[in-house]
Structure formats: C-alpha cells, structure tokens
C-alpha cells in the first residue's frame, strides 16, 4: 500500500467580533410601541361596549312602583277601592289577578289591621 498521509481535523473556534445589535432594546423601541398600539386597537375593537359601560355613568332606571306610592286604598261597602293613581282621576275598584273586583266581607277591618286609623297607601300593602 502506498503511504497515504493522515489528515487531522482540529476544531477551530472563531470568536465573533461583531456586536449583537439585533438584540438591543434601544433599537426596537418603535417596534414595541407599535405592538402596544396594535394591542390597544384590538382591545378597543373587541371590547368597545364593555369599555363604554365601564366608563359611562350608570343610567338610573325608574322604578315602576314609584308611580303608585301616592295611591291609597279605601273601602266602599265590601268593595276595595283605589284612588290617587296618576293616570286616573276618579276612584276605581281594585282588581285581583284575574281582573275581577276585590270584594271582602270585612274590608274596613282589614284596612285598619294594616295601618291602624291612618289611610292605607298602596305602598304599605306592597311592602308587606
């Protein structure tokens, strides 16, 4: 056999001499600001109504029973009557759930048991 020279490979390490400018924070401030701007735009687009509800004052919803607070109950014989409703000028019969007038044998005694000798307002009955 011929005499073949042996070749030996030695690892060579080259130390980088350039600086890693791509990893620098100072160079990419605008990119970070742009990303933050995009995030705020996306939050606004997808959560607009929630943000509006959070920052706007709550609307006060009127209580429908407030209109009935001035109404009073009275008895006419055994019939329960209601007067003082804002949309009615006369005394009308109080109606039950099935739209029939409420007739009770001892109507006056029932009203006295609720509020004594004071006039019985509809609010007194609704709070019980």
From Swiss-Prot:
Swiss-Prot/TrEMBL GO biological process terms: fusion of virus membrane with host plasma membrane; symbiont entry into host cell
Q: Which Pfam families does its entry note?
A: Pox_L5
Please report the PTM annotation for this entry. Answer: Most cysteines are linked by disulfide bonds. They are created by the viral disulfide bond formation pathway, a poxvirus-specific redox pathway that operates on the cytoplasmic side of the MV membranes. Unglycosylated because produced in viral factories instead of the classic ER -Golgi route.
**Which ranges sit in the Virion surface compartment?**
52-107
The UniProt transmembrane annotation reads 31-51
Task: Mention any one GO cellular component term assigned to this protein in its UniProt record.
Answer: viral envelope
Instruction: List the ranges whose topology is Intravirion.
Output: 1-30
Q: According to Swiss-Prot or TrEMBL, what is its membrane topology?
A: Single-pass type III membrane protein
Q: Which UniProt keywords apply?
A: Disulfide bond, Fusion of virus membrane with host cell membrane, Fusion of virus membrane with host membrane, Late protein, Membrane, Signal-anchor, Transmembrane, Transmembrane helix, Viral envelope protein, Viral penetration into host cytoplasm, Virion, Virus entry into host cell
Q: What induces it?
A: Expressed in the late phase of the viral replicative cycle.
Localization per record: Virion membrane
**Superkingdom of this protein's organism:** Viruses
InterPro entries per the record?
Poxvirus_L5
Q: Which cysteines are joined by disulfide bonds?
A: 75-107
**Family, similarity comment:** Belongs to the orthopoxvirus OPG099 family.
Q: What does this protein do?
A: Component of the entry fusion complex (EFC), which consists of 11 proteins. During cell infection, this complex mediates entry of the virion core into the host cytoplasm by a two-step mechanism consisting of lipid mixing of the viral and cellular membranes and subsequent pore formation.
Q: How does it assemble?
A: Interacts with OPG086. Component of the entry fusion complex (EFC) composed of OPG053, OPG076, OPG086, OPG094, OPG095, OPG099, OPG107, OPG143, OPG104J5, OPG147 and OPG155. Except for OPG095 and OPG053, each of the EFC proteins is required for assembly or stability of the complex.
Name it: Entry-fusion complex protein OPG094
Native organism is Vaccinia virus (strain Ankara) (VACV)
This protein's gene is called OPG099
């Amino acid at each position: 056999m011929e005499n073949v020279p042996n070749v030996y490979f030695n690892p060579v390490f080259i130390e980088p001499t350039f600086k890693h400018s791509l990893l620098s924070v100072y160079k990419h401030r605008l990119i970070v600001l742009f990303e933050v701007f995009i995030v705020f735009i996306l939050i606004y687009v997808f959560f607009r109504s929630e943000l509006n509800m959070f920052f706007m004052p709550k609307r006060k919803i009127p209580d429908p029973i407030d209109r009935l607070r001035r109404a009073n109950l009275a008895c006419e014989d055994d019939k329960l009557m209601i007067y003082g409703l804002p949309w009615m000028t006369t005394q009308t019969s109080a109606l039950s759930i099935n739209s029939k007038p409420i007739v009770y044998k001892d109507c006056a005694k029932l009203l006295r048991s609720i509020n004594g000798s004071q006039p019985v307002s509809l609010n007194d009955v609704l709070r019980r």
